[in-house]
């Protein structure tokens, strides 16, 4: 073997090794001028490059190995953490473009992430995130940006979580929570924040519960609790606490009962007792006991009956028999029985009472917390008588 050392025009010191036939078989270079070889180039008998080794951290040992076929790079191996073990493998197509990249993310000498490329752009990544020898995460790309991620969270070889992206931003996530091959949870995102979540509660593939979020907190919940294909429960939240609940108490397909809460306790209830779409009974609570009722008995949306309770028992009832907003009769009760009756000459009620609203008006107020663009396609709610 013959060795020839020379300084190239670039100033780099190079050594050339030749066989007896005068063919170059190896080339060594000190590319940074520190007196140590950091680049090795090996040639085959035809004089074409067969392998290149590089010392990129200049510790005197190769960190990158590039293997050639027909003068073109075919495979590259990399030791990226200076432990002497290969942890990255790159494979090239006939054009010299990266076609596949494999990475050892666990330090056991085996690849756990496989990156596939096409036309200089990422096409798909496959990962074994748990190190169990099975791909449990697949990332798909479109135009160089993430378009979809599939995940196997249970480790049974079946993907159960699917995340969808637009322009690199998460917009939807679907989850098979029961691992039976059926999606039962859907999440919708804006600006990387969850704005709506839909749940299938009985396994028929259709959402039965919808949760709406603002700044990471639930503000509204809709539910088809009877699986009848229509919403029968709507709840509003503020700072994580339930403040209103509107529900179909009879299973008739009509929302008819409204509950209002403060600090977790029930303070008021309103009912549509005749199913005409308007509330006509209002019940007030203190310390979870009824203290007062108000009722509309003639459907004019105005209060004409006031009932008062003590220790949860009815003790007095005022009535507007002429429906003119004034009290004309008063009854006193004991143990559920009338014990005294008084005629009253157009007395003012003990306090002003607000008119009864329609069920739809209350629903609209609750839904106003959620912009129309963020709402789910509503499950039918029956309106009117």
Question: Where are each of the predicted segments found?
Answer:
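N-terminal targeting and processing segments
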Residues: 1-51, 70-71, 96, 143-147, ...
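Acidic, glycine-anchored loop motifs typical of Ca2+
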Residues: 10-11, 33-37, 58-62, 82-86, ...
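Conserved positions within tandem-repeat grammars
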Residues: 16, 38-41, 63-66, 87-90, ...
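Acidic, divalent-cation-chelating loop motifs in proteins
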Residues: 17, 28-32, 53-57, 66, ...
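Pro/Ala/Gly-rich low-complexity, hydrophilic intrinsically disordered segments
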Residues: 91, 96-99, 116-119, 140-145, ...
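Thr-biased low-complexity repeat/linker tracts and other Thr-enriched repetitive architectures
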Residues: 105, 110-111, 121, 129, ...
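Eukaryotic tandem repeat interaction scaffolds
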Residues: 179, 201-203, 207, 211-214, ...
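Ankyrin-repeat and related helical/solenoid repeat scaffolds used for protein-protein interactions
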Residues: 282-340
